[in-house]
Design a protein with these regions (language model features):
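A short SAM/SAH-binding and catalytic strip from SAM-dependent methyltransferases
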Residues: 50-63
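Conserved SAM/SAH cofactor-binding pocket of Class I
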Residues: 1-40
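Short alpha-helix immediately C-terminal to the canonical SAM-binding loop
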Residues: 15-16, 61, 88
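Conserved class I S-adenosyl-L-methionine
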Residues: 83-98
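A short acidic, Gly/Pro-enriched loop at the edge of an enzyme's catalytic core
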Residues: 39-51
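A short glycine-rich, Lys/Arg-flanked "PGG" loop and its adjoining helix->strand segment in the class I
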Residues: 62-77
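Core SAM-dependent methyltransferase catalytic element
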Residues: 101-120
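Short strand-turn motif at the edge of the Rossmann-like AdoMet-binding core
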Residues: 56, 80-85
Length: 120
């Protein structure tokens, strides 16, 4: 089964570089949706995802929790990174309110990443 991928970045240059990297790695662009807007994008809000990976800072991650809750499939995984170590407990508690449970935490040089799973 072919997978479809959605990439979102607010930086237009990052989206351009992603396209170039996809071509270099022989990934078909018709299987990939690229955009530089996640809030107003109707395409994203109509999809349901098996995996969401977000590498952004604490405040944007808090703002995205309701959207992630709507678009992720039950029993699917959410990976959050771009967090300072001391922010990890707060973001875990915040995402718990949206039905996400912590599975694993990784720490490296003052930064942390969390793997969470969406409850059914």
């Amino acid at each position: 089964k072919k997978s479809k991928i959605t990439f979102v970045d607010i930086d237009k240059d990052a989206v351009k570089l992603t396209k170039e990297n996809l071509k270099l790695n022989d990934i078909l662009l018709n299987q990939v949706y690229l955009t530089n807007s996640y809030h107003s994008n109707k395409y994203i809000k109509k999809q349901f995802y098996d995996l969401i990976f977000a590498n952004i800072l604490f405040n944007p991650l808090k703002k995205l929790a309701p959207l992630f809750n709507l678009i992720i499939k039950p029993n699917s995984f959410l990976i959050l990174s771009g967090l300072l170590n001391e922010q990890i407990p707060y973001i875990i508690n915040f995402y718990n309110k949206y039905g996400f449970k912590k599975k694993k935490i990784f720490y490296l040089n003052g930064w942390g990443s969390i793997i969470m799973k969406r409850n059914p």
